[in-house]
Curated annotation (Swiss-Prot):
Domain of life per record: Eukaryota
Swiss-Prot/TrEMBL keywords: Calcium, Disulfide bond, Hemostasis impairing toxin, Hydrolase, Hypotensive agent, Lipid degradation, Lipid metabolism, Metal-binding, Platelet aggregation inhibiting toxin, Secreted, Toxin
Any one Gene Ontology cellular component term annotated for this protein: extracellular region
EC id: 3.1.1.4
Protein name in the entry: Acidic phospholipase A2 BpirPLA2-I
Organism: Bothrops pirajai
Positions of short motif Antiplatelet activity: 105-117
Keyword Metal-binding: yes
Length: 122
């Protein structure tokens, strides 16, 4: 769920996901359209695509389980759908960590009006 996603961002990227990524670029936050503004926004685009492939549960509200093993987040549990949600979140949080240097404050609360180009397919 979105609360867990925020926690994973904190664990993996060391950033406050709720504040930093809630409304960033064209894809971080609710919805998404246009072209990703930078590598950070592309993390959100890929995350949106990943959520779009999840079937049988709701990525925004269903909870999942994970643990940390040797410093890495490992998704667990018996429910394959919830495990898929966890993997989407884990990959996105890792992407945020790996692309911290591309985060540009000018894209914070960027607004959909700036994202009018045709969206690329997942």
């Amino acid at each position: 769920n979105l609360w867990q996603f925020g926690k994973l961002i904190m664990k993996i990227a060391g950033e406050s996901g709720v504040f930093k990524y809630l409304s960033y670029g064209c894809y971080c936050g609710l919805g998404g359209q246009g072209q990703p503004t930078d590598a950070t926004d592309r993390c959100c685009f890929v995350h949106d695509c990943c959520y779009g492939k999840v079937t049988g549960c709701d990525p925004k509200i269903d909870s999942y389980t994970y643990s940390k093993e040797n410093g890495d987040v490992v998704c667990g549990g018996d429910d394959p759908c919830k495990k898929q949600i966890c993997e989407c979140d884990r990959v996105a949080a890792t992407c945020f960590r790996d692309n911290k240097d591309t985060y540009d404050i000018k894209y914070w609360f960027y607004g959909a009006k700036n994202c009018q180009e045709e969206s690329e397919p997942c």
